């Protein structure tokens, strides 16, 4: 046991070294006597815990590291250990690590800037499905600076559509994109029957092909819910067309079918915050805040697997007089959250400043007994809020954009 603890401490010190060391000295560190004595397997255990940005500085130090960082097995091993960040895009891209208080900022890709505003994004494995207000669609890895434009069957922008990204099975060899019209905008179509038949578009990145089919849906995704990609499938908060029940709706990319999962553990109210996120990689989490009392409840599910019933468990509740109101006004962006390794809520939200003319974008770390920290990311004028969500939970990763040649759409 003492030997095991010694190895753990050594790995931790090496991670710290590779995270902080500057590029001109990386090759010297790799060739040092101490490093040369380490088994390559131990090096791999160290490197899969190093932040993505630091790994990219290591990438060109030698061919062996380049081969390792391009190895699919290592890429997903590293991804499984990456901590959640929050990404925001406006004129600039901001990637925030709230736990350590770090924020990196850089410009959007040049070709993004001529496509108009990003209407929405859906993260999956560090890849971002980007939907532009002009109708263009792209898959983007900000860390690797890779973009792939998606040729659209119908390039016209459809703000009433829902989007998703996932993959077929556990191999992750076949990422797919989903698009369908949300029934909340087509109530006249199901007024009599309770169901509607939208076109469902699926694009497979591997084969570079679209397919379209129609399916009868007796539910619709609630407004403000942009969807969550988890373990290859998509999840939304949805409502039955003819029943008051609110539930979790999923889309299975392997079977290419919609599957209802379970009811929400809270009463749904459009004036309250009800936000979906991931928990520990393969569980769902739900943040609920009552606008009337400001009380926050955090719920999590058991492991999400096909064919297994989903059970909700309350992780904790927070009732404090100094709790922030995560959505004080309807015209503010919707908050986004995740749960860190210490079971604290990390939430990004907008708050109106005392002058009533400006808005601060704040990140809170909230535990069961305290508000751990508050950091202001930026400010902007109060008014029409774009995008409609405060940010996105993001995992900086080495996952390459499939067939990542930059093929600009016509």
Swiss-Prot record:
CDD domains: F-box_AtFBW1-like. The keyword Cell membrane does not apply. This is F-box/WD-40 repeat-containing protein 1. Transmembrane segments: none annotated. InterPro entries: F-box-assoc_dom_typ1, F-box-assoc_interact_dom, F-box-like_dom_sf, F-box_dom, Gal_Oxase/kelch_b-propeller, SCF_F-box_component. WD repeats lie at residues 109-150, 269-309. The lineage of its organism: Eukaryota, Viridiplantae, Streptophyta, Embryophyta, Tracheophyta. Signal peptide: none annotated. SMART domains: FBOX.
């Amino acid at each position: 046991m003492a030997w095991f603890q010694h190895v753990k401490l050594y790995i931790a010190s090496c991670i710290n070294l590779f995270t902080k060391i500057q590029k001109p000295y990386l090759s010297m560190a790799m060739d040092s006597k101490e490093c040369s004595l380490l088994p390559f397997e131990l090096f791999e255990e160290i490197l899969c815990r190093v932040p993505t940005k630091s790994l990219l500085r290591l990438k060109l130090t030698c061919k062996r590291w380049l081969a390792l960082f391009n190895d699919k097995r290592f890429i997903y091993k590293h991804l499984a250990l990456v901590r959640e960040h929050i990404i925001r895009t406006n004129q600039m891209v901001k990637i925030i690590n709230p736990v350590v208080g770090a924020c990196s900022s850089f410009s959007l890709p040049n070709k993004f800037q001529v496509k108009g505003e990003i209407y929405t994004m859906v993260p999956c494995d560090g890849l971002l499905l980007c939907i532009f207000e002009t109708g263009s669609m792209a898959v983007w890895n900000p860390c690797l600076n890779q973009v792939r434009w998606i040729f659209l069957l119908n390039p016209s922008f459809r703000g009433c559509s829902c989007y998703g990204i996932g993959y077929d099975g556990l191999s992750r060899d076949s990422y797919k994109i989903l698009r369908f019209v949300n029934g909340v905008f087509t109530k006249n179509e199901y007024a009599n029957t309770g169901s509607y038949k939208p076109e469902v578009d699926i694009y497979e990145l591997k084969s570079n092909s679209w397919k379209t089919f129609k399916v009868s849906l007796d539910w619709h995704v609630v407004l403000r819910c942009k969807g969550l990609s988890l373990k290859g499938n998509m999840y939304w908060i949805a409502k039955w067309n003819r029943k008051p029940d609110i539930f979790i709706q999923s889309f299975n990319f392997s079977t290419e079918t919609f599957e209802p999962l379970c009811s929400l553990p809270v009463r749904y109210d459009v004036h309250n915050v009800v936000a979906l996120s991931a928990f520990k990689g393969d569980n769902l989490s739900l943040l609920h805040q009552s606008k009337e009392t400001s009380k926050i409840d955090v719920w999590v599910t058991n492991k999400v697997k096909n064919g297994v019933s989903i059970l909700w468990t309350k992780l904790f509740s927070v009732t404090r007089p100094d709790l922030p109101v995560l959505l004080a006004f309807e015209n503010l962006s919707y908050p986004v959250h995740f749960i860190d390794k210490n079971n604290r809520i990390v939430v990004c939200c907008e708050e109106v400043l005392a002058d009533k003319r400006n808005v601060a974008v704040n990140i809170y770390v909230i535990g069961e007994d305290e508000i751990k920290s508050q950091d202001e990311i930026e400010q902007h004028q109060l008014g029409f809020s774009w995008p409609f969500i405060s940010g996105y939970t993001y995992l900086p990763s080495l996952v390459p954009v499939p067939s990542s040649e930059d093929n600009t759409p016509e």
